[in-house]
Regions:
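Conserved active-site tyrosine of GNAT-family acetyltransferases
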Residues: 23-24, 93, 117
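Vicinal oxygen chelate
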Residues: 2-6, 29-78, 90-113, 125-128
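Conserved Rossmann-like nucleotide-cofactor binding loop
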Residues: 84, 118
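N-terminal first-folded block
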Residues: 18-19, 24-32
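Short hydrophobic/aromatic beta-strand micro-patches
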Residues: 10-12, 80-82
Length: 128
């Protein structure tokens, strides 16, 4: 039996504070730690959710997704965020600074790019 537990997902960015602010607004999270090049956010006490951390990386390069070209910075991961109203939450994410990606694979998923270019998906439970 393993005692390992996933506690935090870390995303690099040109500006950790800017990206953390975006996800605080998008997810309703709170700042838990704030350092010059590192910000940790998480859900309010008693709420479910995985913590996110953001690290300033001077050589950060935005990923290209999907890509088939050699040399492009490929996506290393993306966040899936379940929502109740896909259109309303997509509009809210865009108002907070996200961009809608060209690649849209499914009707019940919206692929967006955060202010640092990381892809993330908003999705709703598909109805039968």
């Amino acid at each position: 039996m393993s005692s390992a537990r996933l506690s935090t997902v870390v995303l690099d960015a040109h500006d950790a504070h800017e990206l953390a602010g975006f996800y605080v607004r998008l997810l309703g999270y709170e700042v838990r730690a704030d350092e010059p090049d590192w910000v940790l956010i998480g859900p309010p006490p008693g709420q479910p959710g995985t913590a996110l951390a953001f690290e300033t990386e001077g050589a950060y390069t935005e990923p290209v997704w999907p890509t088939r070209r050699s040399g492009d910075q490929q996506m290393m991961l993306h966040l899936d965020i379940e929502v109740d109203d896909l259109d309303a939450e997509t509009a809210r994410a865009v108002a907070e600074g996200a961009r809608i990606a060209e690649y849209q694979p499914q009707d019940d998923v919206r692929v967006l790019l955060d202010p640092s270019g990381h892809p993330f998906c908003l999705w709703v439970e598909a109805t039968p």
